[in-house]
Amino acid sequence: MALLQIAEPGQSSAPHEHKRAAGIDLGTTNSLVASVRSGTADTLKDAQGRSLLPSIVNYANEEAIVGYAAKALSESQPQDTIISVKRLLGRSLTDIQTRYPSLPYRFKASENGLPVLQTTQGDKNPIEVSADILKVLAKRAEESLGGELSGVVITVPAYFDDAQRAGTKDAAKLAGLHVLRLLNEPTAAAIAYGLDSGQEGVIAVYDLGGGTFDISILRLSKGVFEVLATGGDSALGGDDFDHLLADFLAEQVGLETPLSAEKNRTLLNIATATKIAFSEQDSVEVEVFGWKGVVTREQFEELIRPLVKKTLMSCRRALKDADVEADEVLEVVMVGGSTRTLLVREMVGEFFGRTPLTNINPDEVVAIGAGIQADILAGNKPDSEMLLLDVIPLSLGIETMGGLVEKIIPRNTTIPVARAQEFTTFKDGQTAMSVHIVQGEREMVDDCRSLARFSLKGIPPMAAGAAHIRVTYQVDADGLLSVTAMEKSTGVQSEIQVKPSYGLSDDEVANMLRDSMTYAKEDMQARALAEQRVEADRVIEGLIAAMQADGDELLSEAEKATLLQAIESLIELRNGNEANAIEQGIKDTDKASQDFASRRMDKSIRAALAGQSIDTI
């Protein structure tokens, strides 16, 4: 007979209690929060019935002001009003000042070169600013859902690297939130769209937000969302449209540069309003700083056309990575407020040969997808068969002898993932090994991005090649990497979580992929040369060590001279640039030293058998 557990009222959790979870779209321009209520996912609104929260924080007073109230202060208090903070996450101060020279903020560098914003309220870093936005969204969710959140899913651009993802998680922690998962924005859109439509096949998600662009090629099949390939630009978005239009207006007005922070913000606000108006009308009358004139949609489209073309280049690369032709794409899902721009819809439609889907609110679809995923991860849908397969955007590898890159996890590998590979020592008696973690598609370390270094110490002294070091790369569901190196005979190990000090610039991401294709032939030639040089070094060092140990006993003077000549010839070839010549030199040296190697083997066997009888062998 089964025993029933009985608890005092209120002392145990109800087995079917619905946990409060929310999805947060932490956007560059606007942020949203969504949740599943009564089986339906929807965005949660503020007291005024607004879903969108401008991602703007004002620090002019003792308390942070977030959202629409902060936006209203952006012109009068530009240095204390932080806008588009997402662009600053995970970047160095040098990178920010180079890329965004006209930002009105007062910056200083932290000890490790990261940006600190100096405000009337005090110093703030991008993580703290992001946390203040998250706090407002969390409060909205808790008021709407009637209690404390058990966890949240926060969306990030697919191209966010480790530093930017870690910064997002740190901001959530600072806001007092438990992160169930970080979710790629295009994948979140696919969740919302896939569940609504029940479609199966290949779908392209074109996500153009305020500050980032992402393209994802996904395969939807029986509840499985598989990301075939991703691409994009971590610093291209609707904000750039605004800046181009603001610069155009400044020229029309005849303003001298550099502009004051106040004038710059005024121009940007007018540019944003004008851009939005072009979605409904062909021309807009603009009045600014005493200048009055008409700006046409055609003028605006000519300004932004090169940027839209740039997004289509990323689309082309993503299709190639996914091994999919444009005509195989069943639907194109438009995500992000910037996809309301008519030229964007027109050019994307021409590229894919079909009219993009715009029936889902492009501002809300990411948050809704995150809300659905949060509901599942919170345990509210235990019978859910939805499986999410994200991928890593750039290969992760390790440096080996000769400056070569050995790829451990190739790009577009589904995450979470763990891969291991064994390595060995290069020199006799080596007791430590340096592990250099790199990111990129090229064959040589100098052409890839360095992520981190750490050392494994305590390797037992052995002959070169005898030690076995197992290196494991593990990428979690949030795209964060941890690396472990372990010497197998002793179990000694060292571990690091990769959290670089700043993120990739927008051009670096695209260039890393482009260069891997442009220089593919040269890279393979460079790799072949480096591999032969490493092998030559091994042969040279091994032969010199053997001659020092047994040369006087086992070799005549003439034989010594022959081997030394072979070594000198190989050194000369090794310092050249012909891989085939080095390979032949290695073969010649091996052939010249074969008799010496046989004598050393005989000597070792005699020494091992000395003093033993037939019976004991």
UniProtKB/Swiss-Prot annotation:
Domain of life the protein comes from: Bacteria
Coiled-coil intervals, chain numbering: none
Using the UniProt annotation, give all residue ranges assigned to the region (Disordered).
1-23
Q: Name one GO molecular function term.
A: ATP-dependent protein folding chaperone
**Alphabetic keyword roster:** ATP-binding, Chaperone, Nucleotide-binding
Q: Which InterPro entries does its entry note?
A: ATPase_NBD, Heat_shock_70_CS, HscA_NBD, HSP70_C_sf, HSP70_peptide-bd_sf, Hsp_70_fam, ISC_FeS_clus_asmbl_HscA
Cited function:
Chaperone involved in the maturation of iron-sulfur cluster-containing proteins. Has a low intrinsic ATPase activity which is markedly stimulated by HscB.
Family under the similarity heading: Belongs to the heat shock protein 70 family.
Q: What is this protein called?
A: Chaperone protein HscA homolog
Write down the species.
Answer: Vibrio vulnificus (strain YJ016)
Classification lineage: Bacteria, Pseudomonadati, Pseudomonadota, Gammaproteobacteria, Vibrionales
Q: Which gene encodes it?
A: hscA
